[in-house]
Regions:
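Shared catalytic-loop signature of beta/alpha-barrel
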Residues: 62, 68-71, 79-96, 101-196
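Metal-dependent enolase-superfamily TIM-barrel catalytic cores that perform enediolate-based chemistry
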Residues: 1-91
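Electropositive phosphate-/nucleotide-binding environments in soluble metabolic enzymes
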Residues: 2, 28, 54, 78-81, ...
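C-terminal extensions of enzymes
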Residues: 180, 184-220
Length: 220
């Protein structure tokens, strides 16, 4: 993790997201290693992937580097919104709801308990149209948002980028890059420079499918 953090900072990335969830000791060591490697001027987001208990979350965010996080994404299991709310009210760090708010009904529960400061991945609720409904509801209740793409092809990432650029609620560093992908299905895959994607100026989503790749990679 430390070596990757140093490389990304050298490439110009100003915000790093640290994926956690092995165990509490490993997570704390990982956070410290990334912070030391990245330096004090780099913003950190941490994502425990629902693996922390309420007690662990409060302890981790009480560590010296804890208040330094931009936000902590979904620290506890998605169904335990009450614990998420208690963490949010006790923590000096912003709390983001991800898996806990995949649907309108789930978001309502998060809003009722004031369990988050922001939403992550509103597109997971069913596309751009549904995401706008989610964002409108979040806006009424004073929440912000961010978007995340970690395994999408260029088509899905392009949709996410349009949402990111057009919503006033999305005020955080964009969490998107190409991870784990060996191939794409568009003629010119999206590119990120220093963690930032270029603007899409072509019609529609701004990307054009490669018919031959779609045919070859399709599953029947």
């Amino acid at each position: 993790m430390a070596a990757t953090a140093r490389r990304l900072v050298m490439e110009g990335v100003a915000c790093l997201k640290v994926k956690l969830g092995v165990d509490a000791t490993h997570d704390l060591d990982a956070i410290r290693a990334v912070r030391e490697a990245a330096g004090p001027g780099i913003t950190l987001i941490v994502d425990p992937n629902q693996t922390w208990t309420e007690r662990t979350a409060l302890r981790q965010m009480g560590e010296p580097n804890g208040p330094d996080f931009l936000y902590v994404e979904q620290p506890v299991a998605w169904g335990d919104v009450a614990a998420l709310a208690r963490i949010r009210h006790a923590s000096p760090v912003r709390i983001a709801a991800d898996e806990a708010a995949f649907t309108h009904q789930e978001l309502m529960r998060v809003l009722e308990l004031h369990a988050a400061d922001l939403l992550v991945n509103p597109l997971d609720c069913g596309g751009i149209g549904e995401a706008w409904k989610i964002l409108a509801l979040a806006d009424l209740c004073g929440l912000e948002a961010n978007t995340c793409a970690w395994s999408e092809l260029s088509v899905g990432t392009a949709a996410l980028l349009h949402l990111y650029w057009s919503s006033p609620l999305v005020r955080y560093p964009l969490d998107t890059d190409y991870n784990y992908l060996g191939e794409d299905v568009v003629q010119v895959p999206l590119q990120c420079t220093a963690g930032r994607p270029g603007y899409l100026e072509a019609p529609g989503l701004g990307v054009q499918l490669d018919a031959a790749r779609v045919e070859r990679l399709g599953v029947r």
